[in-house]
Amino acid sequence: VSADEPLDAVLTALRSIFGTTDRLPGVAPGLFVPDPARWAPAAALAGDLLPVLLARAQRRWQAPPHVAASLGWKAYTYWLALPAMLGYATARRVPLLTGDAVLVHFDDPRPLVTLGLRPDVPVAVLPGDPFAGRPGVAVVAGEDELLAALRRSLLDQHLLPLLGALHGAVRIGRRVLLGSLASGMAYGLLRAGEPVGPVLTAMGLDGLIDVVPPGAVRRRTCCLAFTLPDPKICTDCCLPTRSCG
């Protein structure tokens, strides 16, 4: 993706935060997938690939099925949501990350799953954006409509089907999973200097995290990492403050 592409701002933000776009754990080098031959649509994670995802998660964390599912969801949704959060925060350009616009594979044994974006992933922008009118770029009326497009694509058309599939396969609560999503989205927004509240409210995820000075995230739910054979307390965990709910 060259400097005259709508999501160049996302790549710039990733380089600013991580120093690279080519060596992010579980993300395709450069974020985009030029050759989809060995990849599958991410929508398959809620179907045929769900057993693969769950088995990989259990082997990775040596955890009961519901704990492995929680941690797998947390890892996947952080890296999935990050391009959308950075695009919105830095340029008010939202890649529409539906289950068909995102590709995944399990060939690399190091991450749980590797994800990448199709080069022609649709992007929603505001009126007056320099990329308005280009093929694959949808112009929406204002900020509310931009956030609505984010919710439809990322949540309704991608993550809620996966959440439903996970919930049907293992005993894991919806609130636990949505708390991890809210936390991951908040981290992405804060990294880019963007207020968290409006985005989480638009996504229906408000009330799941708090932002505490100096700009840290405190969850109101627990990802269950403390139940691992080698227990872990995450930096944003609600357990130390007994604020889980």
Predicted regions and their residues:
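Hydrophobic, aromatic-lined core segments that form the binding pocket/scaffold
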Residues: 42-215
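Contiguous N-terminal and early-domain "leader" segments and peripheral loops that mark the onset or edge
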Residues: 2-8, 93-96, 237
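Generic N-terminal leader/targeting and pre-domain segments
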Residues: 1-71
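Short, surface-exposed linear patches
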Residues: 126, 244-245
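Local cysteine-cluster metal-coordination motifs and their immediate loop/turn environment
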Residues: 220-244
